[in-house]
Swiss-Prot record:
Protein name as it appears in the record: Endonuclease MutS2
Keywords tagged on the record: ATP-binding, DNA-binding, Endonuclease, Hydrolase, Nuclease, Nucleotide-binding, RNA-binding, rRNA-binding
Function: Endonuclease that is involved in the suppression of homologous recombination and may thus have a key role in the control of bacterial genetic diversity. Also involved in repairing oxidative DNA damage. Has ATPase activity. Binds DNA. Endonuclease that is involved in the suppression of homologous recombination and thus may have a key role in the control of bacterial genetic diversity.
Low complexity: bias regions: 9-20
Length: 762
């Protein structure tokens, strides 16, 4: 088997007659290397990548810890054997106890790191892990290398001290002989060699007269590894102390194992929590290392929208942008034009999203439904040993799926292995049955007849891979709503088939079928032209909508300015009136005159400095004139040199004749007013930070910010309210729901602030 997960979601459909295991789904979708790379981020080697916890809860945790980050734990081994030993009242080895300590230490590190983030749900999850006092003592017993710390056991400390002293003496003896003049003729080198746990010398033959000892081994060159007689006694003592140390450690392991047996249920809980935290940090660190994004699968929507998705197997991918809004997608078109990779990309996105594995995608604008099962019929199932042909294998795979519901099925080259006309009728029947069972299906095919038959179904979308006839190459782009041509002759020519053979093949192909291909090409070209026109019209409508919204905002702004000015004048008038009343009441004439003068000064501050020019031009009704930088129409002549005028946007206002100018040589034909450009605010920003503001202040800032954004022509803005107690978030949501110009809003992706930031579409 490959290193793919054993519990993948039914990757292929069944085993062969000889019980050969089917190819895993991730291998069929070319995700094997990507998944293998992802697995390297786990602390514990594992077969499965599936999440045992709730997806929504896990996604919430990922959003919360994204900005903070999660440390990487030390590599750990499988815990099943530890549980089995403790269940059977066995004794754990020191390294097995250290496996428990590594997990405990990581959880303590996380609890300390998130101690201040009490508002996070992830903090609640960590706080639910309460370590019994025994485990705190157990952590303190080991150093980072998995050895017993000095001071933890007095007997062990004394033995280690004796062992170190004896080893130093042994090394000293070896170094003494290595510098000895009597032994120099027999020394191969002056180094100390470690053999069978003993420090020894490497000597040439004939040394027996110069030194006594035990030969431990001979080298490949015929030399002798000798343990000197004087060092032999020390080596025996070292071995004896080593045995005593082992006995001491065994006693400690027995004591610790006995204590761990009392906490067996907690250990099972600990291992399960560590595995979850490990899967969490692996996903987060994998996403950060390769700049990937998470997509939470939708449990309510059936449509699939991918924006800027890139399949991991492609080195220089062309990002995929696709909306799959119906129950079935039939992909046709040019050979080697990307149909199979499109199929694999859609299935891969669903597979990665289901397991919350990050991918290269614009997560904010993408929607991926949750599928209970995902199946791929991509590879040729032919098996000569079991007497199974290509078509028979396909039928066997389909028969296993006919009872499935709520699955995503991908079938590559659906017509493979049999007569095209018969296959069209057969597959139409099979596909319609699967569609009735609430399944979603993606197929690639060159069957024009099958595509035409399926196109009659309202739940079927058509998609064609396009071909550039000028460059004679596929464009790796797709067009909705049409059946594509295969371009088999052009593809064969591109891959080296001689031109004269291609021409001969075309004569056999027949004039009628060539005409059918021409009709298909013309239909495709017409569809592309209509699509371009629709895009042009949509852009024009958006521009008009923007101008309309900008004008409405400008009107509201002018009304507000007028209202504020009115209040200011009323306040000034009341202030001057109060001064006069107070002086009249005091009956002080001289003071009264002074205060009247003072009141006049207050009122004079608010008089307009603008004087009406004396040069006035007369106009007639329905005459065109220029007001500031706009072309206007004279609607009505008023008294005292004033006129009612109408702007190009249909707005009527009163203006003095001095502000109007004659238009020289007006055009004889239809009046074409120039485009009006509403000035954008200089201080418009894409982001507003409301953290630390009171609700009333925040709503005022938010209202002004949205007005500036609309005038600035922004379609999306960011509003940061923080995560706190949620009161400010509630006010912001309520305001956005009731704002007439807000199309929609949602939480930002993890890298932009998560649930503490709203992305607002205007």
């Amino acid at each position: 088997m490959s290193d793919a997960p054993k519990r993948s979601l039914n990757p292929t459909l069944m085993m062969n007659n000889n019980n050969t295991p089917p190819k895993p789904l991730e291998e069929s979708l070319d995700l094997k290397e990507f998944i293998a790379l992802f697995k390297t981020f786990f602390a514990k080697e594992r077969d499965t990548i599936a999440l045992e916890n709730d997806l929504k809860q896990t996604f919430t945790y990922l959003n919360e810890v994204d900005a903070i980050g999660l440390p990487t734990p030390k590599s750990v081994k499988e815990s099943d054997l530890i549980i089995i030993k403790l269940t059977k009242l066995g004794t754990l080895h020191l390294d097995e106890i250290f496996e428990i300590v590594k997990r405990l230490h990581y959880i303590v590190v996380l609890q300390n790191a998130f101690k201040t983030f009490t508002h996070l749900k992830f903090h609640e999850r960590l706080n639910a892990i309460v370590l019994p006092p025994f485990f705190n003592d157990l952590i303190a017993l080991f150093d980072d290398e998995g050895k017993i710390k000095q001071g933890a056991n007095a007997t062990l400390d004394a033995l280690n001290e004796s062992l170190n002293r004896l080893k130093k003496e042994s090394v000293k003896i070896i170094h003494h002989y290595a510098r000895s003049k009597e032994l120099a003729p027999y020394l191969v080198d002056t180094q100390s060699h470690l053999k069978h746990g003993y420090e020894c010398l490497l000597l040439k033959s004939g040394f027996s007269g110069a030194i006594k000892g035990v030969v431990l081994e001979r080298s490949a060159n015929g030399y002798f590894y000798l343990l000197p007689e004087s060092a032999q006694k020390i080596a025996q003592k070292i071995a004896q102390i080593g045995n005593e140390i082992d006995c001491c450690i065994v006693e400690m392991c027995q004591t610790l194992s006995h204590s761990l047996q009392k906490h067996l249920l907690f250990l099972k809980f600990l291992f399960k929590e560590f595995d979850f935290l490990d899967s969490l940090q692996a996903r987060l660190n994998f996403a950060k290392a390769y700049n990937l994004e998470f997509v939470m699968p939708s449990f309510t929507q059936k449509k699939m929208i991918l924006e800027n998705f890139s399949h991991p197997i492609l080195k220089e991918p062309k990002p995929l942008n696709l909306k799959f809004e119906k129950s079935m997608l039939a992909v046709t078109g040019v050979n080697a034009g990307g149909k199979t990779m499109l199929l694999k990309s859609l299935l891969s996105a669903a597979f990665l999203s289901k397991h919350l594995i990050p991918m290269k995608i614009n997560a904010h604008h993408s929607i991926i439904p949750y599928f209970k099962e995902i199946h791929a019929i991509i590879n040729d199932p032919q098996n000569s040993a079991n007497n199974i042909s290509t078509f028979a294998g396909r039928m066997k795979q389909f028969s296993a799926l006919l009872s499935k519901e709520n699955m995503l099925l991908g079938v590559d080259e659906i017509e493979l292995g049999t007569d095209a006309d018969e296959a069209s009728s057969l597959y139409k029947t099979l596909l319609e049955k699967l569609l009735k069972q609430n399944n979603q299906i993606i197929i690639t095919t060159h069957h024009k007849r099958l595509s035409v038959l399926m196109a009659e179904n309202k739940e079927v979308e058509l998609l064609a891979a396009l071909y550039d006839e000028e460059k004679e190459r596929p464009t790796y782009t797709f067009l909705k709503g049409v059946i594509g041509k295969s371009y088999a002759f052009e593809t064969a020519l591109r891959y080296g088939v001689p031109h004269f053979l291609i021409e001969k093949a075309k004569t056999f192909y027949g004039e009628d079928k060539e005409k059918l291909n021409v009709l298909i090409e013309n239909s495709s070209a017409l569809e592309r032209e209509l699509k371009q026109k629709n895009e042009h019209l949509e852009n024009a409508l958006k521009e008009q909508e923007y101008l309309k919204n900008a004008w409405l905002l400008e009107m509201e702004k002018q009304k507000e300015i007028f209202h504020n000015k009115k209040l200011e004048l009323e306040k000034s008038y009341q202030q001057a009136l109060n001064i006069l009343k107070s002086e009249v009441a005091s009956k002080d004439t001289s003071s009264m005159h002074k205060e009247i003068h003072k009141a006049s000064e207050i009122l004079s501050k608010h008089k307009t400095n603008q004087e009406i020019p004396q040069i006035i031009t007369n106009f007639q009704a329905n005459e065109k004139a220029r007001y500031k930088n706009e072309s206007v129409l004279i609607v009505q002549i008023l008294d005292k040199g004033y006129y009612w005028i109408e702007t190009e946007l249909g707005m009527r206002l009163k203006a003095h004749g001095s502000l109007l100018k004659k238009i020289q040589k007006p055009p004889k034909n239809k009046f074409k007013p120039p485009k009006t450009t509403i000035p954008k605010p200089k201080e418009a920003s894409l982001r507003l930070d409301l953290r630390g503001q009171r609700s009333e202040e925040a709503l005022d800032l938010l209202d002004a910010f949205l007005n500036d954004a609309l005038l600035g022509g922004f379609e999306e803005v960011l509003i940061c309210h923080g995560k706190g107690s949620g009161i400010l978030e509630k006010f912001v949501k309520e305001f956005l729901k009731n704002h007439p110009k807000v199309v929609s809003f949602s939480d930002a992706p993890i890298n932009l602030g998560g649930s503490g930031v709203k992305i607002v579409k205007l």
